[in-house]
Amino acid sequence: MTTSRILWGIGIVVAGIFLLWGYKYSPRKIEFSGHYKKIGAHRVNSLDKLKKSLSNFDAIELDLVFDPETNVLDVHHPTAPSTGLTFTRYVAALGDKQPFMWLDIKNLDKSNAKLILQKLNSVFLEKNYPKQNVLIETRFPEKLGLFTKAGYKTSYYLKQDLYKLKQTDLHTELEQIKTILETQPKVGISTEHFDYEILKEYFPETTKYIWCIRHSKISDYTLVRNILKDETVALVLVTYHPL
């Protein structure tokens, strides 16, 4: 084997590595092709990631924790320490852009729902931000009606891994979801892609918000495609690690 062939082979390997590396960090994955307008960036909890996400997505998701003592919505996931980034500052950083925002409010419940609604209304009014571009998500759906009436989109963050439950336990969970949706028919439901088939079967007409952040590129390919094609699925969150 000549030196030129060896160098040629090394060049191909290096190029392949760079292509795979670039694909890993690209939001334009093959399994999402044809539906890029339907995907959003998951956990955009910093201004740097926000700036880069806005160049690649029409929708973003972020985590919020409300502090009633200071009347502040803090942008962070409870598994990570707060960086001091407030939602007011976050929205100001959008400039004139108005992406669809999926707000996972970690501690929204009946004790603080009215305060959170007032805070959100204040922030969005100042920016003249359209409420129909905002999804309010919580594990405690009892007060979501307040946000629905105010003009926001809303979603009940379901218990995870329904597909792992025994039939009796699954039945109990499904009945609870049905009760919520009967009393609040405009509320959507949100969960990870693993439970999509269950939601499709039992809640075929309900608006769904799904995240695909741990899917297999091969074994889950068909499932992800079916999720994206489903007209009742409003948005799919995907992993995004900007360079």
Each model region followed by its residue ranges:
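Phosphate-group recognition and catalysis centered on beta-loop-alpha active-site segments
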Residues: 4-243
